[in-house]
Regions:
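N-terminal regulatory/effector-sensing and dimerization cores
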Residues: 21-109
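A hydrophobic/aromatic-rich effector-binding and dimerization subdomain
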Residues: 1-19, 79-144
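Detector for methionine-enriched segments
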Residues: 7, 21, 56, 73, ...
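Short intrinsically disordered, low-complexity coil segments enriched in acidic
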Residues: 2-6, 67, 170
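An amphipathic alpha-helical interaction segment
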Residues: 126-170
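Generic alpha-helical secondary structure signal
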Residues: 8-10, 62, 150
């Protein structure tokens, strides 16, 4: 069997010092349900993505960002020329960057912690950014930084993630 329906952090990140991985989602591939120990951020850069999360279907469009927490069954399908990026983040990195953005509003932090970590339906977040140019630029910069593999790139990526979360919450 080539596909594993469950993936642990060590399977993806291994001994890498990095906590964040970017990938372009392959188009025209079979849809398969899966879950994993890390966070997945689906970013629809252009076009449409058919996404099912815990049995609930969603059609994501250009500019939409979906945060899927660990241990959440989901699938993604792209069957045209759409461009979708996946950002895969270790759980500890997500917590340290995302919740650092929320320190000023403990009620909001509590809400997100509840939504993202409870084992109930709907424990994911979808942001409709309406293709906000600042968020689009940040995604591009995150991707370029990731591909560059320059010295201190993971420090930059963690810092950029904090800014990205703050932009989404605006």
């Amino acid at each position: 069997e080539a596909w594993y329906p469950y993936m642990e952090e060590k399977d993806l990140f291994g001994d890498l010092s990095g906590n964040i991985m970017f990938s372009k989602h392959y188009r025209y591939t079979p849809i398969f349900d899966h879950e994993h120990e890390f966070f997945e951020i689906i970013c629809v850069y252009d076009g449409t993505s058919h996404t099912t999360i815990q049995g609930m279907s969603h059609e994501l469009h250009t500019g939409d960002i979906c945060i899927i927490p660990p241990h959440t069954m989901h699938s993604i399908g792209i069957f045209d020329d759409s461009l979708v990026f996946n950002i895969l983040i270790r759980g500890s990195t997500f917590q340290s960057t995302f919740f650092q953005s929320l320190t000023a509003d403990s009620a909001l932090a509590h809400f997100f912690a509840h939504v993202l970590y409870r084992k109930t339906e709907g424990n994911y977040l979808i942001f409709h950014t309406f293709d906000d140019i600042r968020i689009r630029d940040m995604l591009e910069n995150l991707y370029i930084e990731y591909l560059g593999h320059e010295k201190y790139s993971y420090t930059f990526l963690n810092s950029m993630l904090i800014m990205f979360w703050a932009m989404l919450l605006r």
